[in-house]
Swiss-Prot record:
Disulfide bridge positions per record: none
Biased composition (Polar residues): 93-106, 261-273
Predominant localisation class: nucleus
Species of the source: Danio rerio
Annotation: DNA-binding region: 180-239
The protein, known as: Homeobox protein Hox-B3a
Cited PROSITE patterns: ANTENNAPEDIA, HOMEOBOX_1, HOMEOBOX_2
Compositional bias per record (Gly residues), positions renumbered to this chain: 107-119
Compartments where located: Nucleus
Gene name in the database record: hoxb3a
Pfam families assigned: DUF4074, Homeodomain
Length: 417
């Protein structure tokens, strides 16, 4: 019965409608395939300790079913539709196979129904192959478990010792797992001294020098590279903190160059407001500057009253020799050349420093008292009122000399006071 049904199936479906458990169709003729199936059936029976199913093995369905039997021997967890009991003796299994094929045979007995039954048999074989393949792929063998555990142990073991972390854990294991578990490298003082020395000379190492230092310090190249990266970041951080500190409390070291600029700005505004230069000026010079501002306010009105004096911005170069030959000869041409504040008489209104000595008030050379200074300022203002346009050269002399005096005369003031 079994042989006839199997041979009828093979003749009806032409020997190529069935698919093996691996999902490929078999186009070979039936006799050659019978031999291979016979060999496989014998091997699988010997492997699974099956009883003999007969001398002639059925061609293709038996091949698929023996594959299923092989899978059931490896792992007896197939779906209940093909194997209702989990572990079945082979004769019952062959009876089930024959019964399923016999039920498919009447459907294909008609002339046109062969294709339909072939489709159903294909679907059944496909379902059987799909049922066997997931069980085969889902099965986890012990060597797979061992290899995964070994790799995990390899990844976690370098964290125990720093030497392994330097060699294998840092380079071979993935960075995400190793970075969190890698031990902190402890550098000796000698290594740190050498690294700091090298960093002092050049902050970026070339690779030959890095290899040389690695051999010299018994460190890995990776450690030296990472140390230099961290050291550069620390250096940048220190530079930023220094920059912030110098900008906040910084006018003390860096303020000496800007002070002349501030003073020049104050001198430019001195014709309009008295308080502009008082702030940057040192407290010891407050008296002379206040006196000078008194003079500036005294001169301000005659300037407004005398229209020809509006040319004073252009006239100082013409009257520079006269001013240098004037009463303050000790602040001569070197001072004028040495002061960058004076540029072509642009800061003509910067007059407030030691105006009395500039104007021939040599009886007040040392600014002995505020009253005398103010008297001198009023005297000069009176003179300026009498002839506002004529003594214009002397006024330009004062304005031309002052930028140099405001910077250089501070030391003589200290000695005189």
């Amino acid at each position: 019965m079994q042989k006839t049904t199997y041979y009828d199936n093979s003749t009806l479906f032409g020997g190529y409608s069935y698919q093996g458990a691996n999902g490929f169709g078999y186009d070979a003729p039936a006799p050659a395939f019978q031999n291979s199936a016979h060999l496989e059936g014998d091997y699988q029976r010997s492997a699974c300790s099956l009883q003999s199913l007969g001398t002639s093995a059925p061609p293709q369905p038996q091949h698929a079913k023996t594959k299923e039997l092989n899978g059931s021997c490896m792992r007896p967890s197939l779906p209940p539709e093909h194997h209702p009991p989990p572990q079945v003796s082979p004769p019952q299994n062959t009876v089930n196979v024959a019964a399923t094929n016999a039920t498919q045979q009447p459907g294909g007995s008609g002339g046109g129904g062969g294709a339909g039954s072939g489709g159903t048999s294909k679907s059944s074989s496909k379902s059987s192959s799909m049922a066997t393949n997931p069980t085969l792929t889902k099965q986890i063998f012990p060597w797979m478990k061992e290899s995964r555990q070994n790799t995990k142990q390899k990844n976690s073991s370098p964290s125990a010792s720093s030497a392994n972390a330097e060699s294998s854990g840092g380079e071979k294991s993935p960075p995400g797992s190793a970075a969190s578990k890698r031990a902190r490298t402890a550098y000796t003082s000698a290594q740190l001294v050498e690294l700091e020395k090298e960093f002092h000379f050049n902050r970026y190492l070339c690779r030959p020098r890095r290899v040389e230092m690695a051999n010299l310090l018994n460190l890995s190249e990776r450690q030296i590279k990472i140390w230099f990266q961290n050291r550069r970041m620390k250096y940048k951080k220190d530079q930023k903190s220094k920059g912030i500190g110098s900008s906040s409390g910084g006018p003390s070291p860096t303020g000496s160059p800007p002070l002349p600029m501030q003073s020049s700005a104050g001198f430019m505004n001195s014709m309009h407001s008295m308080g502009s230069y008082d702030a940057p000026s040192p407290p010891s010079f407050n008296k002379p500057h206040q006196n000078a501002y008194a003079m500036s306010t005294a001169y301000q009105n005659p300037m407004k009253g005398c229209p020809p004096q509006q040319k004073y911005g252009n006239t100082p170069p013409d009257y520079d020799p006269h001013g240098l030959q004037g009463n303050s000869g000790n602040y001569g041409t070197p001072n004028m050349q040495g002061s960058p504040v004076y540029v072509g008489g642009n800061y003509v209104d910067a007059m407030p420093a030691t105006g009395p000595s500039m104007y021939g008030l040599n009886h007040l050379p040392h600014h002995q008292s505020a009253s005398m200074d103010y008297n001198g300022a009023t005297q000069m203002s009176a003179n300026q009122h009498h002839g506002p346009c004529d003594p214009h050269p002397t006024y330009t002399d004062l304005s031309a000399h002052h930028p140099s005096q405001g910077r250089i005369q501070e030391a003589p003031k200290l000695t005189h006071l």
